[in-house]
């Protein structure tokens, strides 16, 4: 590797590469979530017949993974670079390897392995065939072909590539701690994020109000249901995301038992499934506007028969 890219140069390089492949460059969605997959730019757009190619950075919050800024690799919040392509290009794996080359990682000079790791997200009723991508022994990417999202079978096939930006940057910059990553020239990751990491960890494990969180979960759940009754998919999905984050805070606090945990996950999943079905129905009412004319006419004709 000739040049050690900064964290933001890694993002810019990936954005430029996937822009060249026809992806829309979206911005991070403004509601807390545990993974880039839970953004509406993936969760909603992976279902239904319309094509969709997008790439975006997604800050992902996982309260139970917080370590007060003391662990070099475990974080309350990390950053994913998410790529979703529907229909999946036949050469998606080759494109991924080419993206690594853009980052200065020559696949011929490194041990890059696709290790089978089928993916499932029980709280959203989603699953797919997947692989972890290991670079010289370090997992840097999750690669998935969605089979089901929100309880609905996907078609056409959607591929998702999720880069772990902190791990990738640690490898490229040859540092052992994420806090030593150069975000930009002269500015380290820790100078930006170590204090929020400490504070969010303290809040998640010690300070959060369990009764308030339990009450909010129920309120968010009811508001999602109310929005769905009005056919308002996107506001409803925002409240599903709020339910998910609230549950994650409760889980980190140890406020839910094993039995209760399964119940909360089922409640989130049931909402996510209704959101998914309603989204496809609403897109159909609009005539699936992202489809080309011939495909749209054929599909709507089949549905009418």
UniProtKB/Swiss-Prot annotation:
Q: Where in the cell is it found?
A: Cytoplasm
PROSITE patterns linked = AA_TRNA_LIGASE_II_GLYAB
What's in the GO CC field?
Answer: cytosol
Q: Which GO terms describe its molecular function?
A: ATP binding; catalytic activity, acting on a protein; glycine-tRNA ligase activity; transferase activity
Query: InterPro entries per the record?
Result: aa-tRNA-synth_II/BPL/LPL, Gly-tRNA-synth_heterodimer, Gly-tRNA_ligase_asu
Catalysed conversion reaction: tRNA(Gly) + glycine + ATP = glycyl-tRNA(Gly) + AMP + diphosphate
User: CDD domains in the record, alphabetically?
Assistant: GlyRS_alpha_core
**EC class (word):** ligase
Signal peptide extent: none
Q: Pfam families per the record?
A: tRNA-synt_2e (PF02091)
What does the entry give for GO biological process?
glycyl-tRNA aminoacylation
Q: Which PANTHER family match?
A: GLYCINE--TRNA LIGASE, CHLOROPLASTIC_MITOCHONDRIAL 2 (PTHR30075:SF2), GLYCYL-TRNA SYNTHETASE (PTHR30075)
Looking up NCBIfam families in the UniProt record yields: glyQ (TIGR00388), PRK09348.1 (NF006827)
Q: What is this protein called?
A: Glycine--tRNA ligase alpha subunit
């Amino acid at each position: 590797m000739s040049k050690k890219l900064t964290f933001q140069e890694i993002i810019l390089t990936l954005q430029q590469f996937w822009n060249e492949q026809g992806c829309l460059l979206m911005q991070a969605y403004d509601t807390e979530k545990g993974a880039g997959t839970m953004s509406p730019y993936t969760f909603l757009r992976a279902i239904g017949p319309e094509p969709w190619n997008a790439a975006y950075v997604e800050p992902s919050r996982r309260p139970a993974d917080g370590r007060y800024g003391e662990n070099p690799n475990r974080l309350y919040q990390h950053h994913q670079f998410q790529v979703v392509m529907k229909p999946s290009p036949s050469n998606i794996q080759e494109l991924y390897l080419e993206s690594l080359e853009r980052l200065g990682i020559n696949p011929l000079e490194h041990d890059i392995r696709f290790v089978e790791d089928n993916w499932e997200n029980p709280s959203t009723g989603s699953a797919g065939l997947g692989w972890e991508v290991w670079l010289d022994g370090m997992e840097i990417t999750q690669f998935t072909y969605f089979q089901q999202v929100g309880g609905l079978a996907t078609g056409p096939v959607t591929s998702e590539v999720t880069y772990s930006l902190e791990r990738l940057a640690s490898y490229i910059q040859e540092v052992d701690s994420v806090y030593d990553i150069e975000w930009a020239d002269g500015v380290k990751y820790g100078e930006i994020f170590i204090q929020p990491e400490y504070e969010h960890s303290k809040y998640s494990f010690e300070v959060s109000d369990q009764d308030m969180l339990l009450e909010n979960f129920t309120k968010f759940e009811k508001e999602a249901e109310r929005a769905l009754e009005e056919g308002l998919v996107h506001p409803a999905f925002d409240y599903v995301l709020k339910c998910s984050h609230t549950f994650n805070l409760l889980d980190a606090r140890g406020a839910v038992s094993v039995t209760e945990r399964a119940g909360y996950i089922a409640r989130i999943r049931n909402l996510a499934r209704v959101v998914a079905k309603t989204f496809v129905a609403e897109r159909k009412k609009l005539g699936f506007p992202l489809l080309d004319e011939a495909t749209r006419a054929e599909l709507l004709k089949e549905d009418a028969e």
